[in-house]
Amino acid sequence: LGSVLNGGGSWPNGKQSSVSDWVTLADDYFLASTDQTDGSSGIPLIWGTDAVHGHNNVIGATIFPHNIGLGATRDPDLIRRIGEITALEVAVTGIDWVFSPVAAVVRNDRWGRAYEGFSEDPQIVRSYMASMVRGLQGDKATDSLFSPSKVVATAKHFIGDGGTTDG
């Protein structure tokens, strides 16, 4: 086992999980994956979670507006700062990988997941994607790339997602 996906609706001890519940589970995953008593290699696994508008599976985490609302701000620096806050709140729970940002270019407002896209303009989506990734992972230019308060970002929903016909 090399990785664990914590999808939407998954919690360590039920829906009301605290930060300490998440940290305990992260510690348990780490200890189990590095245990070499059965002859395994002891390589730590990577744990990923959905964090599209904050670390929304954790009670008390900061929840940001959905991407469609953020897209209306026309403020890439705001998107970067949201990524920084999200990364910190995910990192302190022991998770090191997020399934974010969403790269969908919404072309049909009737699409059921239109709220997940930043814009119907590919240039805005591109700009916001870059800003969010810098916020989540850090920036090589500032020596913050993958510092302890950062997480690995994963662009998702990009090839044809958002380009639906009839909603």
Where are these regions (language model features)?
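Glycoside hydrolase catalytic-domain context in secreted enzymes
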Residues: 1-167
